[in-house]
UniProtKB/Swiss-Prot annotation:
Molecular function, one GO term: methylenetetrahydrofolate dehydrogenase (NADP+) activity
UniProt organism field: Mycoplasma pneumoniae (strain ATCC 29342 / M129 / Subtype 1) (Mycoplasmoides pneumoniae)
Residues reported to bind NADP(+): 149-151, 215
Similarity comment: family membership: Belongs to the tetrahydrofolate dehydrogenase/cyclohydrolase family.
Residues that span the membrane, as ranges: none
Gene3D superfamilies on file: Leucine Dehydrogenase, chain A, domain 1 (3.40.50.10860), NAD(P)-binding Rossmann-like Domain (3.40.50.720)
Subunit structure: Homodimer.
Recorded coiled-coil stretches: none
InterPro entries: Aminoacid_DH-like_N_sf, NAD(P)-bd_dom_sf, THF_DH/CycHdrlase, THF_DH/CycHdrlase_cat_dom, THF_DH/CycHdrlase_CS, THF_DH/CycHdrlase_NAD-bd_dom
Lineage per the UniProt record: Bacteria, Bacillati, Mycoplasmatota, Mycoplasmoidales, Mycoplasmoidaceae
Name of this chain's protein: Bifunctional protein FolD
Length: 269
């Protein structure tokens, strides 16, 4: 079973419109020339527009210095009109990604990439998977779960969340020698390696549940997931396509987190 994630996420997003978003503001800092990032940013800004929230994109040239960015982040941290800050990844190679992320005020870290926000929010990719899990009634109890790819914006947060919540989960990266063997016996596979159609139908057991978090472009510059969709419906009980699968729900999660940050800010005024 597959589904239209874009439509479903939009329907859920519309249920948030009963709140007053007029004083909510999201600022996105872009320090890359990545086409996929451009698409993700548009989705986030469109979601803000749908709900009536404010959004601002600040795009930097490759000549930007780390000092300039840190000063800008500090300015946004202290601006009472800014609710949430996103540093769109990846960053230019000469910039220290972790240093920039750590500079963001935890109370404005809408992506939860610092992991330091004391408010009840989660990493957007984790929240996206959990929204889908709940909506489609996927029970992970006593299931063998394999997460492939442990990057900071993809499989890493998902793996750590599942491990911390007591699930039977194994994390695989490029150093794992038996990844394919683990996948073949897994009940749930979550892929986040960013390689177009890397996994085939033959890699999975019948009845598997597949969350495809990876995003990349093939030789034709077409947006793809990690899992080849050709024939996958014959093996998988359920799978999320790319594009239009997990991605729209990460945007939904950002808006969900943004509202929590806004409410917390209002309480502190």
């Amino acid at each position: 079973m597959s589904f239209d994630g874009k439509q479903l996420a939009h329907e859920i997003l519309l249920t948030y419109k009963n709140r007053d978003w007029s004083q909510v503001k999201l600022v996105i800092l872009q320090t890359n020339n990545d086409v996929s990032s451009d698409a993700f940013i548009r989705q986030k800004m469109n979601a803000c527009n749908t709900l009536g929230a404010q959004s601002e994109l600040i795009k930097y040239h490759e000549s930007v210095t780390e000092k300039e960015l840190l000063e800008k982040i500090q300015q946004l941290n202290t601006d009472p009109e800014v609710t949430g800050i996103i540093l769109q990844l990846p960053v230019y190679p000469h910039l220290k990604q972790n240093k920039l992320l750590k500079a963001i005020d935890p109370y404005k870290d809408v992506d939860y990439l610092t992991g330091n926000c004391p408010l009840p929010i989660r990493s957007c990719v984790v929240e996206a998977v959990l929204i889908l899990k709940e909506h489609f009634h996927h029970d992970f109890t006593n299931k063998q779960i394999v997460v492939v790819g442990l990057g900071v914006t993809g499989g890493g947060p998902i793996f750590h969340y599942l491990k911390e919540t007591g699930h039977q989960v194994v994390g695989c990266d490029k150093h794992t020698p038996n990844t394919m063997e683990l996948i073949k016996t897994a009940d749930v596979v979550i892929t986040a390696i960013g390689k177009p159609h890397f996994f085939k139908t033959t890699n999975f057991k019948p009845g598997v549940i597949l969350y495809d978090v990876g995003v990349s472009r093939n030789v034709l510059n077409k947006l793809c997931g990690d899992i080849d969709p050709n024939g996958i419906e014959k093996v998988a009980k359920w799978w999320s396509p790319t594009p239009g699968g997990v991605g729209p729900f990460t945007v939904l999660a950002i808006m969900k987190n943004l509202w929590v940050l806004y409410e917390a800010h209002q309480r502190r005024i």
